[in-house]
Amino acid sequence: MKKLFPLLMLFGLTLLSCGSDEDSLQKIDQIFNLYIQDSSGKTMLNPSKIGSFTGVSFNDELADKDIANVNFSRKMLEDSTYYIEYIAGATRKFVNDEPDGSKIYRSLIEVSLTKKISDTQNDPVVIDSMEIFYRSSPSVFEVSRVLYNNQLVFTKVQDQPNTATITK
């Protein structure tokens, strides 16, 4: 029994130390959804429709290499609206420290869009830029704002999805 007591005590302390404190977890909110539509509100990201951007690619402009593809997913809502879901993959460079103690990082992505104009022809590739700023603190890592072609298209609103719509 004398040998069992220290083992039970050690086991009990181990269980107590494994408890988690929800406040100590950092919330990650880095999914960004990009919608591209025409002036009438029609989706322009349908991968097979004439008049849409059937070819889309992302290139990391802050990477060490000239060609550094960035992964994204083209997704579709139930109403057949297509959008791009970007989660992560581009280089993040430190920008500055904020007065509240958080840190700001940025990614710069070249967005190449190929528009299908007939069954056999495409328009010349459109090259756009997307600059994503992130805020990092002990409690949260989140997309804070997004510039598309140097125009502010997204500013973070707490508990809202990170979504922007571009009209072309």
Residue map of PLM features:
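Tryptophan-paired
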Residues: 52-118
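C-terminal motif of bacterial Sec signal peptides marking the signal peptidase cleavage site
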Residues: 14-17
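Positively charged n-region of N-terminal signal peptides that target proteins for export
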Residues: 1-4
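A short, Gly/Thr-enriched small/hydrophobic beta-strand-prone motif that recurs across taxa
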Residues: 24-37
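Short amphipathic, basic-aromatic surface patches that mediate peripheral association
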Residues: 36-49
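Short coil-to-beta strand junction motifs in C2/discoidin
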Residues: 28-29, 47-56
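Bacterial signal peptide processing site
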Residues: 19-22
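Glycine-rich, aromatic-bearing surface loops/beta-hairpins
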Residues: 119-168
